[in-house]
């Protein structure tokens, strides 16, 4: 029985990794052994940072809402508590967007929530 060498398969696997390593510095873009380590690490970073991005954006929205609410003499925690009591169900992403781009709409929401403080 002849020996089965996995030439096609390993070449395909190498090409796939080297394609992902395109643009890396030094031997990391041409040497398979180095490239596979760099690609694995890059994919781990990408996975981790997709989760961190959600965390970072939530923090950004809270900062924007807090800054806009302080112009009306409130603080963020009071405002969010008043919104909950008022039954206004708007998420932080939309509130931050209103605070930045539609100041009149945000002001009306703040006025409605002030009654519940």
Swiss-Prot record:
Specify the superkingdom.
Bacteria
Similarity-based family: Belongs to the bacterial ribosomal protein bL20 family.
The record's section on PANTHER family has:
39S RIBOSOMAL PROTEIN L20 (PTHR10986)
GO CC: one term? ribonucleoprotein complex
Q: What is this protein called?
A: Large ribosomal subunit protein bL20
One example of the protein's molecular function in GO is: rRNA binding
List the source organism. Answer: Rickettsia typhi (strain ATCC VR-144 / Wilmington)
**Could you tell me the keywords of this UniProt record?**
Ribonucleoprotein, Ribosomal protein, RNA-binding, rRNA-binding
One of the protein's GO biological processes: ribosomal large subunit assembly
| Summary of the function given for this chain in its UniProt record | Binds directly to 23S ribosomal RNA and is necessary for the in vitro assembly process of the 50S ribosomal subunit. It is not involved in the protein synthesizing functions of that subunit.
């Amino acid at each position: 029985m002849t020996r089965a060498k996995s030439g096609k398969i390993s070449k395909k696997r190498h090409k796939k990794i080297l394609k992902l390593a395109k643009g890396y510095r030094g031997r990391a873009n041409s040497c398979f052994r180095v490239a596979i380590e760099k690609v694995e690490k890059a994919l781990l970073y990408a996975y981790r940072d997709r989760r961190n991005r959600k965390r970072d954006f939530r923090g950004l929205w809270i900062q924007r809402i807090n800054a806009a609410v302080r112009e009306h003499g409130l603080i963020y925690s009071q405002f969010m508590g008043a919104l909950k009591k008022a039954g206004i169900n708007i998420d932080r992403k939309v509130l931050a967007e209103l605070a930045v781009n539609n100041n009149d709409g945000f002001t009306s929401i703040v006025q409605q929530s002030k009654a519940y403080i």
